[in-house]
Amino acid sequence: MKAAVITFPGSNCDRDLATAFEKAGADVTRVWHKDTALPEGVDVVGVPGGFSFGDYLRCGAIAARSPIAAAMIRHAERGGYVLGICNGFQVLTETGLLPGALMRNAGLKFICRRVDLRVATADSAFTSGWAAGDAVRFPIAHHDGNYTADPETLARLRGEDRVAFTYLDNPNGSMEDIAGILSANRRVLGLMPHPERAVEEAQGGADGMGLFRALLGGMALV
């Protein structure tokens, strides 16, 4: 399986994300924000964490209008897989590939620690390695991770089983404890916690590998 990991000015988790894909068995290509096309035959696009373009205007707003973002949107619209982590989640909401917005944390402070999550659905390639209700632990590192959406969007996410992860102890004020959501076709996932920072026991736990292995396995079955 082939993965492409985007690098924007200000990205700081792109190498971690590429390494996680490689550990799961993917052939990884790094792409630059000025590129106008994805590599031939890419199965999944990874949008990493960091502070793309310094978080100017809004987190992810400038990155969402970069040349490579247009190629990513086309990939998603064709049914391709996309994984956006932290700033990558913010980029996905700015592009419209995922609904809602990521606002300033309720406590108005940057949060950097490990959090416990509940796998809210196993019905996606990203989460199929777990059962709904399983607990996993990933790091978080964000200032603007407070997921916000209108009541209609929240009801749709619940009704369509598109909430992928929830916080067991909400650290940032996210509505309904939401930590990650899926697109309508379940092939785009955005989440604020960092599974790519939890792929080796030396990092304090390897729960994140469950996501990457499940994703590659799920894509292979399509």
Swiss-Prot record:
Pathway: Purine metabolism; IMP biosynthesis via de novo pathway; 5-amino-1-(5-phospho-D-ribosyl)imidazole from N(2)-formyl-N(1)-(5-phospho-D-ribosyl)glycinamide: step 1/2
Record EC number: 6.3.5.3, 3.5.1.2
SMART domains from the UniProt entry: GATase_5
Molecular function, one GO term: glutaminase activity
Gene3D superfamilies: 3.40.50.880
Example of a GO biological process term: 'de novo' IMP biosynthetic process
Catalytic activity: N(2)-formyl-N(1)-(5-phospho-beta-D-ribosyl)glycinamide + L-glutamine + ATP + H2O = 2-formamido-N(1)-(5-O-phospho-beta-D-ribosyl)acetamidine + L-glutamate + ADP + phosphate + H(+); L-glutamine + H2O = L-glutamate + NH4(+)
Glutamine amidotransferase type-1 domain boundaries: 2-222
Pfam families for the chain: GATase_5
Active site: C86, H194, E196
Any single GO CC term annotated in Swiss-Prot or TrEMBL for this entry: cytoplasm
Subcellular location: Cytoplasm
Sequence intervals crossing the membrane: none
Domain of life: Bacteria
Keywords from the UniProt entry: ATP-binding, Cytoplasm, Glutamine amidotransferase, Hydrolase, Ligase, Nucleotide-binding, Purine biosynthesis
Major site of localization recorded for this protein: cytoplasm
Role of this protein: Part of the phosphoribosylformylglycinamidine synthase complex involved in the purines biosynthetic pathway. Catalyzes the ATP-dependent conversion of formylglycinamide ribonucleotide (FGAR) and glutamine to yield formylglycinamidine ribonucleotide (FGAM) and glutamate. The FGAM synthase complex is composed of three subunits. PurQ produces an ammonia molecule by converting glutamine to glutamate. PurL transfers the ammonia molecule to FGAR to form FGAM in an ATP-dependent manner.
Subunit structure: Part of the FGAM synthase complex composed of 1 PurL, 1 PurQ and 2 PurS subunits.
HAMAP family: PurQ (MF_00421)
UniProt protein name: Phosphoribosylformylglycinamidine synthase subunit PurQ
Annotated source species: Cereibacter sphaeroides (strain ATCC 17023 / DSM 158 / JCM 6121 / CCUG 31486 / LMG 2827 / NBRC 12203 / NCIMB 8253 / ATH 2.4.1.)
